[in-house]
């Protein structure tokens, strides 16, 4: 399937995948309901899809993959569903701790980790420590956990205000680059392509600052059914776009 990505455009130039792809992993519950299964079965299937798509992204040359795993609004779901999602994350992190170095996969977290269980926070910290010792050029998966775009911006504003109060920064110092350094995504390029499966046509509070010039790809495919061929179609659609960044094509 990688041949679909490593294709050529009308000028005959090879088309590489975007450097940074972000995905809103949506549709797990509906996937399960269509099959008469509990919603937790959909989340389990979605977790397997994440593993497969992350591996494929790494293999075709994507450097960063950011996924929306659990939003600040997802706490409104049933206690059983939240517990199941956190259990899947724990299992994934336990596996990742043992394989990250061998597979050359860096793992980073976006979001406010304060409400997360101490055990899960400790695992996330351990993966961060392992990632810090891996080469920066290695593939990196960013997992958005208890994340919301507005919350991220508010936390960044508070950190900047605290630095101003401490005399370390001045309000007039603030520009795009400085503000970006206070975000969860600091040091990571903005996503060129944001993908949302499941047929929904909204961002749902995902990467609100970082998506300023992202291209969007929406598909009716539910996340557990999202496969390498669908990702290839998303990347092909991305390459068909005329990205002008507010300018005029010469």
Could you say what each language-model-derived stretch is?
Residues 1-250:
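Flexible, compositionally biased loop and terminal segments
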